[in-house]
Amino acid sequence: MKICIQGLGFVGSAMGVAASLSKNKVVGIEQPTQEGKKIIESINKGIFPFKTNDKALKKNLKILSKKNLLKASHLNSHYEDADVIIVSINCDLKRKNNEQKINLDSFKKAIKQFAVKIKEETLVIIESTVPPGTCKEIIYPLIYNSFIKRKLDPKKFYLAHSYERVMPGKFYLSSITNNWRVYSGINNVSAKKCRNFFKNSTDDFNW
């Protein structure tokens, strides 16, 4: 199974390690910015790109990198043969008149990057914290319309949401692999596939 992690921030990078522990091939995708290139280079060297005192996280990343089970890239072409895509990117917050409002423009742009690439039967899991209705009103239509334009069956992609649950610290990796997950799907099939993914394709998830 090939898994793509979109967004290699503090959570996405750790999720990449967690997902590859069960010998899945994982590719983390990050933007080719100056910071993004540093993250990509670090992961491909087997070094966690952020400060952490979790020895298990650092050790496993080094091992997985050497085994070519986990790598990082800026190429969107990796989405083309992915079986699962995990979205782990931030939504922009903008302050106006002393109020914070969420701007989803960059988030939608990120979704479009893989929506035009993925194949039928791909499972998309949103780990990002998003406003209620985002999956149904924004993400699902973007992928659906892309499938129509590409003459693919719009019923043959699966969308689920399972928000990130992490506890940074010396047991950071364990907090990902040994924590209860809450999940929901755009339909029953998507929900079932999401559950099966976390249950069978990652290391020691609880349900």
PLM segments and residue spans:
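Residues at the starts of beta-strands that form the adenosine-phosphate
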Residues: 2, 25-26
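Rossmann-like NAD(P)(H) cofactor-binding subdomain of soluble oxidoreductases
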Residues: 93-165
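Internal alpha-helical scaffold of NAD(P)-dependent oxidoreductase catalytic cores
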Residues: 22, 141-162, 166-207
